[in-house]
């Protein structure tokens, strides 16, 4: 009977241990599924989930929501010239610069894909968004990352598309994201190394 009881308790203990290990594994898998493997910041899936939540919150509270799309200028040339190891290191460095450029708990920096990053800034006006952009550009200038094959400069630079909205039921979040992407395209068209902010009244481009 004692042996049976010991065996039974051992079985329970083992089962609990296995359940705990499974729970840890599930948390790790959940973490990995939302984390970009290279830069260790949020990935596109995490961005999409967060964007849905913040859009609905901004719509309900009638508060401004800012999106930014950032692209590293002439990154293919950087990669081809320096090799993929340095290219990966560059992506990691930019990711960390972006993370340090925002500080509030709900601000999100994610890798959108390739050399493109996206930022969600809840409760952020256009004026405040410009301050964040300027901080990002200054930090990248200070980092002084060599890019000898860039047609612009010997330093790495970035282009950004930025837009702020107070969403209503009439607005569509995917259409808004496309507008931000269009601003990024305009920033590239107008010489890169800067940003475009667009609203119903004006288009603004400031070279860094």
What residue ranges belong to the model's regions?
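PAS-family sensory domains
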Residues: 1-11
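Short beta-strand edge/capping elements of PAS-family sensory modules
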Residues: 3-4, 64, 193
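PAS-associated C-terminal cap
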Residues: 10-24
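Conserved nucleotide-binding and Mg2+-coordinating catalytic segments in signaling enzymes
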Residues: 30-49, 70-84, 92
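Catalytic-core segments of nucleotide cyclases and related cyclic-nucleotide turnover enzymes
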Residues: 84, 122, 126-134, 151, ...
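A short pre-motif secondary-structure segment
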Residues: 108-111
């Amino acid at each position: 009977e004692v042996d049976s009881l010991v065996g039974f308790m051992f079985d329970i203990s083992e089962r609990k241990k296995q359940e705990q290990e499974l729970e840890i594994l599930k948390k790790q898998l959940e973490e990995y599924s939302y984390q970009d493997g290279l830069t260790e910041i949020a990935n596109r899936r995490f961005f999409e989930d967060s964007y849905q939540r913040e859009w609905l919150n901004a719509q309900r509270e009638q508060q401004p929501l800012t999106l930014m799309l950032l692209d590293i200028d002439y990154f293919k040339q950087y990669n081809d010239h320096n090799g993929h190891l340095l290219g990966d290191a560059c992506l990691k460095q930019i990711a960390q610069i972006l993370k340090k450029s925002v500080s509030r708990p709900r601000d999100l920096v994610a890798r959108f894909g390739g050399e493109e990053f996206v930022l969600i800034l809840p409760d952020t006006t256009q004026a405040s968004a410009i301050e964040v952009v300027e901080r990002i550009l200054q930090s990248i200038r200070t980092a002084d990352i060599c890019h000898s094959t860039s047609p612009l400069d010997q330093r790495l630079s970035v282009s950004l598309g930025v837009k702020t909205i107070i969403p209503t039921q009439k607005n569509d979040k995917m259409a808004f994201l496309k507008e931000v992407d269009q601003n990024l395209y305009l920033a590239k068209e107008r010489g890169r190394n800067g940003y475009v902010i667009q609203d119903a009244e004006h288009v603004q481009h400031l070279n860094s």
